[in-house]
């Protein structure tokens, strides 16, 4: 089973965004994009990356968030078109990033457009809210978490919340009993970071993972490739970002 991981493509353009959509925290992100980010995130490089991945013939693609810059409706439509072009929902699993929920917004016009790519299999053991979701592909259990929450200006932190962590624990236990290789995906790093950029309940996530465990955790957010180990109680869990 070969799984590809892509994160933080920031693939959208902000040219269609209306000025009235920027009369909030988004204006800071817009200025960052206008002055710097639009040159840092190249569609050509993304296209080459996807072509390389296609050559590797992965069985599944996981995208760990930040498809957009500001989570605006026009961006989410553009990202939806891009997702539909590169693969079907049963081939691609995504979780949202902090840029995808930059501010509180109508989910039907924003993240809801990607729902088919971040929902449980129809017969999965997942019950309750959308996250965490469970998708089983061969011997692998793909468990997707959402750490994306609206934050104040100059903050890019994330949070999972008690309810999501409780459901995560149940899914990890159920899939362990099935003998599946469990991959947990979220946008923010599970390691401790600054309060401005980190996962606020990273400690609670560690406690959850310390029980049933997981075989692998993958994340994005840092805009750099990394490989580490997460110490969750007596367990050492590989982490790729």
Protein language model features and the residues they cover:
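Beta-strand-turn-beta hairpins that frame and shape the catalytic cleft
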Residues: 1-4, 133-144, 176-181, 230-238
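N-terminal active-site segment of His-dependent metallophosphoesterases
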Residues: 1-78
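Divalent metal-coordination and catalytic microenvironments
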Residues: 8, 61, 66, 79, ...
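Active-site environment of divalent metal-dependent phosphoester hydrolases
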Residues: 10-14, 69-72, 98-106, 150-154, ...
């Amino acid at each position: 089973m070969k799984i590809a991981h892509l994160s933080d493509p920031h693939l959208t353009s902000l040219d269609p965004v209306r000025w009235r959509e920027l009369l909030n925290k988004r204006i800071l992100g817009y200025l960052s994009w206008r002055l710097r980010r639009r040159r840092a995130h190249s569609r050509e490089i993304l296209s080459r990356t996807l072509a390389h991945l296609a050559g590797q013939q992965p069985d599944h693609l996981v995208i760990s968030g930040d498809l957009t810059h500001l989570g605006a409706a026009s961006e989410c439509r553009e990202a939806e078109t891009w997702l539909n072009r590169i693969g079907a929902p049963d081939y691609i699993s995504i979780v949202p990033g902090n840029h995808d929920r930059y501010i509180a917004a109508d989910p039907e016009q924003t993240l809801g457009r990607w729902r088919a790519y971040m929902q449980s299999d129809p017969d999965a053991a997942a019950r309750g809210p959308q996250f965490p979701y469970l998708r089983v592909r061969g011997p692998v259990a793909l468990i997707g978490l959402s750490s994306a929450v609206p934050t104040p200006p100059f903050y890019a932190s994330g949070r999972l919340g008690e309810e999501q962590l409780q459901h995560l624990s149940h899914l990890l236990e159920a899939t362990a009993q099935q003998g599946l290789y469990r991959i947990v995906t979220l946008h923010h790093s599970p390691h401790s970071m600054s309060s401005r950029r980190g996962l606020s309940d990273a400690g609670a996530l560690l406690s959850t993972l310390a029980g049933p465990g997981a075989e692998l955790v993958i994340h994005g957010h840092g805009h750099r490739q990394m490989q580490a180990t997460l110490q969750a109680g007596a367990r050492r869990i590989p982490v790729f970002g």
